[in-house]
Amino acid sequence: MFRLTAKIEIRSAKTWVFDKVASVEITRDIETLTDTCVLQLPKKVKWQGESTLPIKRGDEVTVWLGYDGDLQFAFRGFITTLGLKTPTTITCEDYMFRLKQREAKKLTYKDATIGQILKDQKLGIGYKVFGEQSIGQYRVTADTLSALLGQLKDHAGVRSFIRIEDDEPVLYSGVLFERGKSPKQVFATGLNLIDDTQLKVQNAADVKIKVKAVSLMPNNKKIRVEVGDTDGE
């Protein structure tokens, strides 16, 4: 039987490492830009004699998960909120948390590309463009880099997400389909979907049906009723 194992590392004034956790919930969704992780620590966590919670918003968190000690990297991000109750609940966001704090440069383009916009913004992390396209005239009006990515999504259908590669964050941005070209569905009509040798003639008189119903009364007494054909299914 496999045993779930985990390792949680929190870098604050000190580095805290936990090999046990009550629960971990990681959510990845390119529609929302930001991956999230919610950790619930065990009830009896000891903070080495600290009188107050020694971690805070903005501390880096790394999560590894696996079975029987075979751990795989699962998430890296930053604390956004800390629960006050016991057990401690920690909510984290990936590196998009940092991009929410960096100001976007207000620039104007006559014929912008995704790559050019990202290059000009000096993101502070690596980036890769998939499905590079020209998005025409464009003006950056967003206040933060994260808001800019959201603006690109709404304006040109550009999806963005962050992944960790070689221990470093990398922003992926691009379009899933070419602009102005919707995926086409082709339907064929007049075709048999089932081999006619599999079809069988079935008369209503040959179909045997039996229905069983059980009702639980307020006094916990059960009433059973069967209707239909005695040899029905």
Model-derived features: positions:
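Short acidic-glycine loop/turn motifs at beta-strand connectors
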Residues: 13, 164-166, 217
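N-terminal export/assembly leaders
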Residues: 36, 97-105, 115-140
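Polar, S/T/G-rich
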Residues: 111-120, 143-156, 208, 214
